[in-house]
Amino acid sequence: MEFGKIIISETAANSENPQDVVNSNISVINLMREEKIDDDLIHEDALMSYYLDFYASKYAEGNFSKFVHDSGWNKELNELIEEGLALIGAEKHLELFKEQSRKLRLQSNIKLGKFLKDKYDAPNAFKDLLNNNAYFELDENLVELNAAFLKSHPDTEVLSVDEMFKTLEEFVGHEIKRD
């Protein structure tokens, strides 16, 4: 049975910082994974938001090459990110992602494979080729768009931390240890 909800905490929902909303969703997904809940059972839009944050975080950490390296350039993940960017209305980010993906597809699979196997911090012309600072100049804020998407989603429930645990415990069928 799929968990048909996106859960964010009251604290996050009331925060002025949109990253708090995104982080709340991430925390719920991480907790569900710790409880061995398969991704297929987690709300697909909650997961999409999770992976959009992964993309944005990796880009901010080390540009497009960092995302490619740390994701292993996973086709399924890339499709999810494309769908997610479109869904939250990040049209400029979507166009850049598609452009970067095309650039990568034109490269040799051997070069990509070597890049993915090497340590990221090693000097690498392939890494430099992948980077594109246009991301940082776009006037679309992915965190704000992602948070607004989560807050306005029809399946989103804003709950206290106790209510969050109770809801998840009902789904998994046992008490969840709180740290």
Label each PLM-derived region with a short phrase.
Residues E2-Y59, H69-L77, G84-D179:
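Extended, alpha-helix-rich binding/interface surfaces that flank or overlap catalytic cores
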Residues A60-F64:
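Boundary/linker elements of alpha-helical solenoid repeat scaffolds
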